[in-house]
């Protein structure tokens, strides 16, 4: 088994959801996480705040990301899977996919 990173991305201007729709979306996320935990493949994950800072060469710090970008990283999971195809199959259940979100699946290198 190997560890894989799921990076959840979405439009900086997502469709506005009503409070009732947000509750349904959050329940889908919680159900997905619980399913991954029951299968013993969920290792970690958290949503990310919409803004942050970037450290560059010579210790220059810039604000960002900005809404001009195509997509914002909204969160991450670390999961355990036998290979990237199995990890992709897990990612297909992401509740944001039907709303236009994306999931980038990356193999985490062992060091």
PLM region spans:
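Conserved, structured core segments of small domains
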Residues: 1-111
